[in-house]
Design a protein with these regions (language model features):
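N-terminal pre-domains immediately preceding structured catalytic cores
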Residues: 1-185
Length: 185
C-alpha cells in the first residue's frame, strides 16, 4: 500500500510540474518545491530521485521585497556557498562566523533564524514575477539553506527562504550545480 501511495504522490507531482511546463523532463536537474506539502522533489531527467521535507515562509507565499514570504515561480541556483563547512556551521552575510548552531529538534520557534551548513542562493527567472524591481528573489536573498530549528521542518516557519534539515542540504548541495532550476509552487 505504501509503495502505491508513493507512486501516486510522485505521479501527482509530475502531473503538476508538467502542467507548468511540459518540457521539464529535458532539464538535467530540477528541484520542485511543493508549498502545500512542504516537500522538495529532486528530479533528474524527468524522474523523481529523492524527496526532502522543507519549511517555507511562516508568512505564506509572495514575491514583494520585505514581505518575508516565499517567492513563487521558476528560479535557478545563482550561487552555492558553504562548501566543506562543518555541519550546523552558522553563516552570517553568507560567511561562516566560526560558530556551530545548537540544533533544536522540538517544534519550537526561537528568536533567531540561523542560516546553517550550506546556502543555495536563488535567482528568479520570471521578469515581473520574481525578477526585477521590488520583487527580485536574488536581491531579497532567498536561499535554500539549513536551519537550527529542525523541529519545525515540515511546516511553514521561515522568513521567506526554504529551510532544510542540515544533513539534507549538505547532501543536496553536492548533487546540484549552479544554474540548476528550482521551481516553487
Amino acid at each position: 500500500m505504501l509503495e502505491n501511495q508513493n507512486n501516486f504522490n510522485k505521479n501527482s507531482v509530475l502531473e503538476k510540474i508538467e502542467s507548468i511546463e511540459s518540457s521539464y523532463e529535458y532539464l538535467d536537474t530540477l528541484l520542485y518545491v511543493d508549498i502545500p506539502s512542504q516537500q522538495m522533489f529532486f528530479i533528474k531527467k524527468g524522474e523523481i530521485v529523492d524527496i526532502y521535507s522543507i519549511s517555507s515562509s511562516y508568512y505564506g507565499t509572495g514575491n514583494k521585497v520585505n514581505s518575508l514570504m516565499t517567492p513563487l515561480g521558476k528560479h535557478e541556483i545563482y550561487k552555492k556557498l558553504g562548501e566543506n563547512l562543518p555541519e550546523n556551521a552558522i553563516l552570517k552575510g553568507r560567511v561562516w562566523n566560526g560558530a556551530i548552531a545548537d540544533i533544536i529538534k522540538e517544534p519550537l520557534d526561537t528568536d533567531f533564524d540561523h542560516v546553517t551548513s550550506r546556502i543555495l542562493w536563488l535567482d528568479g527567472l520570471e521578469e515581473g514575477k520574481n525578477k526585477g524591481p521590488g520583487i527580485d528573489s536574488r536581491e531579497r536573498y532567498i536561499y535554500i539553506h539549513g536551519t537550527a530549528e529542525e523541529g519545525l521542518i515540515g511546516k511553514p516557519a521561515s522568513d521567506g527562504c526554504i529551510r532544510m534539515y542540515n544533513k539534507d542540504v549538505i547532501e543536496l548541495f553536492d548533487l546540484v550545480d549552479e544554474k540548476a532550476q528550482v521551481w516553487i509552487y
